[in-house]
Amino acid sequence: MPKTSKRLASLVNKIEERAYEPLEAIKLVKENATAKFDETVEAHARLGIDPKYTDQQLRTTVALPHGTGQTVRIAVITRGEKVAEAKAAGAELAGDEDLVETISKGEMDFDLLIATPDMMPKVAKLGRVLGPRGLMPNPKAGTVTTDLAAAINEFKAGKLEFRADRTGIVHVRFGKASFSEGNLLDNLKTLQETIDRNKPSGAKGRYWKSLYVTSTMGPSVEVDIAALQDINKDG
């Protein structure tokens, strides 16, 4: 443990306490991702919202152009021929009441749960186990749907759901340290645009308080939000 602390301290010393240009911030994160595995790169955005008010909540999805670099394990709660359809589309788990029963026991070997609308009354009873993990299917997030194949393909390709936590901070993984700087920047830009586009109606004052990017084992680097917003993806 002390070895890790010493390593992290030396990396922190490389970073100045200021907001960096987006590409510069990503370069620093990549340089500091020196662990022996391919570290996940994450964004942490502090927003000027208070999610205890319903008109200041943020929950949506983003389709990252270059994916997350992670394998997403998907479970689907449905019935009849839709079970076979979900499995054929690539879902790791699919079932009806049997899967509901398995989940109710706390067995959740998946990262994302999709349900068809007809199964939601049964899924709603799983709120106690699904809610704290952020796994409850939601129509706004695209996880309550009858078009299972399309939803499974989108989430496998890099679409992901995110929400602001109770303190108004959004935590999103947007790639791997092995990604090119350009691909990480594309993904981060897409995330910023999604957060701006879904600004809650009740948000007051300054919407973006801060934005940091980091890798699994590396230090955080602050990003200049205005500079990120000014980037023209088509330019």
Swiss-Prot record:
GO molecular function: rRNA binding; structural constituent of ribosome; tRNA binding
Keyword terms, alphabetized: Repressor, Ribonucleoprotein, Ribosomal protein, RNA-binding, rRNA-binding, Translation regulation, tRNA-binding
Keyword RNA-binding: yes
UniProt keyword annotation of rRNA-binding present: yes
Listed Pfam families: Ribosomal_L1
Superkingdom of origin: Bacteria
A biological-process GO annotation: translation
Family per similarity comment: Belongs to the universal ribosomal protein uL1 family.
Assembly description: Part of the 50S ribosomal subunit.
Database matches in HAMAP family: Ribosomal_uL1_B (MF_01318_B)
Protein name: Large ribosomal subunit protein uL1
Originating species: Synechococcus sp. (strain WH7803)
